Regions:
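Short glycine-/small-residue-rich flexible loop motifs, especially phosphate/cofactor-binding loops
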Residues: 88, 102, 138
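Structural signal for hydrophobic
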Residues: 76, 116-117, 140
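…primarily DNA-binding HTH/wHTH and HhH modules…
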Residues: 123-157
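Residue-level detection of the helix-turn-helix DNA-binding "recognition helix"
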Residues: 106
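Basic nucleic-acid-binding alpha-helical/helix-turn surface characteristic of O6-alkylguanine DNA
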Residues: 1-96, 143-157
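Short Lys/Arg-enriched helix C-cap and helix-to-coil transition segments
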Residues: 112-121
């Protein structure tokens, strides 16, 4: 499976492709580097995101999971940048419980592109399995808020 690794402010990231679609984004450096046009495009869009120049991604993705997890991940993709929803909010949309939404979030194969960092507990941030955990989640949420404020788009202060 072609994959491309690169440095980011939240650590090294590896994006993988199968059949012309992004199938995973993992923390760490991948062993089997094979650049493709799509992987370069993904890397460039992620760099622009981290540079505060982009909030949305225009990439074909194909997360692999159970039908329930796929419903949860679809619900995450409609949360606007700079905003959050609670696990319970997502459960109302996708079905199941807040706890099952947390399980689907933890199994998200394409974090950042599928913005599981925008889901929070009703009494705080909740958890985050990517990078350094909660500091990474805080960083991503703060980055989106700063980008919105700098671009003057709705949702900025």
């Amino acid at each position: 499976m072609p994959q491309l690794s690169f440095h980011s402010p939240v650590g090294d990231l590896t994006v993988s492709e199968a059949d012309g679609q992004i199938v995973s984004l993992d923390w760490g450096w991948g062993r089997d580097q094979e650049e493709t046009k799509l992987l370069r495009r993904a890397r460039d869009q992620l760099h622009a995101y981290f540079d505060g120049q982009r909030l949305a991604f225009d990439l074909p993705i194909a997360p692999v999971g159970t039908p329930y997890r796929c419903r949860v991940w679809a619900a995450l993709r409609v949360i606007p940048p700079g905003e959050t929803r609670t696990y319970q909010d997502i459960a109302r949309t996708a079905g199941g419980s807040a706890r099952s939404v947390g399980g689907a979030n933890g199994a998200n194969p394409i974090p950042i592109l599928i913005p599981c960092h925008r889901v929070v507990a009703s009494r705080g941030l909740g958890g985050y399995s990517g990078g350094d955990g909660l500091p990474t989640k805080r960083y991503l949420l703060d980055l989106e808020s700063r980008t919105l404020a700098a671009t003057g788009r709705p949702g900025g202060p």
